[in-house]
Amino acid sequence: MAKNYDSVEFPYCDEVSKYERLAKIGQGTFGEVFKAKHRQTGKKVALKKVLMENEKEGFPITALREIKILQLLKHENVVNLIEICRTKISPTANQYNRCKGTIFLVFDFCEHDLAGLLSNAHVKFTLSEIKKVMQMLLNGLYYIHRNKILHRDMKAANVLITRDGVLKLADFGLARAFSLAKNSQPNKYTNRVVTLWYRPPELLLGERDYGPPIDLWGAGCIMAEMWTRSPIMQGNTEQHQLTLISQLCGSITPEVWPNVDKYELYQKLELPKGQKRKVKERLKAYVKDLYALDLIDKLLVLDPAQRIDSDDALNHDFFWSDPMPSDLKNMLSTHNQSMFEYLAPPRRRGGHMPQQPANQARNPAATNQSEFDRVF
């Protein structure tokens, strides 16, 4: 697949006026996302506007990369790119500005994102439903990694869920193809990827020759969040994020992570010493299932070479013990409104460890979001 990566072309673009915009559902550095419907068929879609203002040399490389990748990836658990549209080109356009129209990526519409669902205290996931969410998420990662693509921005807001309960990995704006290092020459990918709270320790230490384990760390953060209802490590800076990781996963040392001292930043940063690994201990107040705790623990391994991959994760006992994964459709059918992070109140953050849940007998997956602040 990687061989075909640079040869993909996208065909003639229709005008975006064929769609009627209904509501804005997303905003970020990438641009805006709108819910829309096809004027003739009524089909609901999501329109992702490509920001062009700062592009002096033509079409943004990040958008081009996203389009090429999404044309190659076709899987039930990956968002589907329908087409690329543009605004009407001015009749006065010439050879120099004929491409200045706004470009939109058109996707199948998904009613929710996971961050929006977790922000709503009325949305209660059972253990079976959490298993289904994580099974679909890991299936999506298995597929993209098998096809030599890294997502590089795993977070709850980039996990979409349809009204029928089908999960879709979304926002491939930071994604890229990867390959094994050639002729002993390491890859030199940018490490300025992945939202800080979900960024793995190898990227924070400056690694540029990385691979699928960076996405699995994000999957571990998301899995824990299914119970805590908010991101588990909310650092303010890269140094702070590494400190939070050390406090949860244990001190970063060559004993637990061979050759970690090769990183220049490892010598420069003041990392916490003498920290014990406490992933299971800190999460057991929220996560009562022992298999779930064990899988989170294996996903949040400091050394990327020892971190569990998507194939082994899908074969973990968590997915093959009672209660088995169950469909989300019935639970979602009780919620008529779409839920997106952009439309939800700001996710709370604070500087202290929250109190233990008051009622331990209650299902931790169904605990009211208002009881928690930052977890770690």
Swiss-Prot record:
Main location: nucleus
SMART domains: S_TKc
Cysteines joined through disulfide linkages: none
KW Transcription regulation (keyword) present: yes
Bias (Low complexity): 354-369
Catalytic activity: L-seryl-[protein] + ATP = O-phospho-L-seryl-[protein] + ADP + H(+); L-threonyl-[protein] + ATP = O-phospho-L-threonyl-[protein] + ADP + H(+); [DNA-directed RNA polymerase] + ATP = phospho-[DNA-directed RNA polymerase] + ADP + H(+)
Keywords: ATP-binding, Kinase, Nucleotide-binding, Nucleus, Serine/threonine-protein kinase, Transcription, Transcription regulation, Transferase
Leader peptide range in chain numbering: none
Subcellular location: Nucleus
Enzyme Commission number(s): 2.7.11.22, 2.7.11.23
Pfam families recorded: Pkinase (PF00069)
Region entry Disordered, spans: 345-376
Chain positions recorded as ATP binding sites: I25, G26, Q27, G28, T29, F30, G31, E32, V33, K48
GO biological process: positive regulation of protein localization to chromatin; positive regulation of transcription by RNA polymerase II; positive regulation of transcription elongation by RNA polymerase II; transcription by RNA polymerase II
Record GO terms (molecular function): ATP binding; cyclin-dependent protein serine/threonine kinase activity; protein serine kinase activity; protein serine/threonine kinase activity; RNA polymerase II CTD heptapeptide repeat kinase activity
Function comment: Member of the cyclin-dependent kinase pair (CDK9/cyclin-T) complex, also called positive transcription elongation factor B (P-TEFb), which is proposed to facilitate the transition from abortive to production elongation by phosphorylating the CTD (C-terminal domain) of the large subunit of RNA polymerase II (RNAP II) and SUPT5H.
Family (UniProt): Belongs to the protein kinase superfamily. CMGC Ser/Thr protein kinase family. CDC2/CDKX subfamily.
PANTHER family (alphabetical): CELL DIVISION PROTEIN KINASE, CYCLIN-DEPENDENT KINASE 9
Protein name according to UniProt: Cyclin-dependent kinase 9
Lineage summary: Eukaryota, Metazoa, Chordata, Craniata, Vertebrata
